[in-house]
Amino acid sequence: AGNIPFTDSFIKRVHMLSRLPVSEINTLLGQVGLFSDISAFIAAHREHCVIATGNLDCWVEKLLSRINVESHTSSARVEDDHIAKITNILQKEDVVKMYKALGDKVVFIGEGNNDMEAMRLADISIASALVHPPATSVLSITDYLVFEEGTLCRLLNQLC
């Protein structure tokens, strides 16, 4: 991971997956397991939580509907249940800039190279190692590193 720029990698992944029906990917991702404590934290603090994912809106629609929180995604034009064209690749740092311009304090949780700039701009950044180790690039700029769901939730409660 991290050997090629995120945008190039993302375009290649979308191209590979474009052979599959969008509805099938959406259904499969809609069944992905969620961290129960994090889900409960989001539900209790819904007005202060936002998801920023580089994934395509048409792929993560069902997953995001389960979480039921404001979200920002990449987008694509879909034709005959297949990706016809990527129309926007989310730059997560733009989401951070938007909320900071509104006067909000931004706590950003990420783990990948594509999170680095957003984490750098956030008021507080948290590198997550809940699923896999964070990219080396984010370790140099993060304020906190968490390995367990309970630890992340305790930290978020302290920061709120």
What are these model-predicted stretches?
Residues 1-44, 61:
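A metal-dependent, Asp-based hydrolase signature
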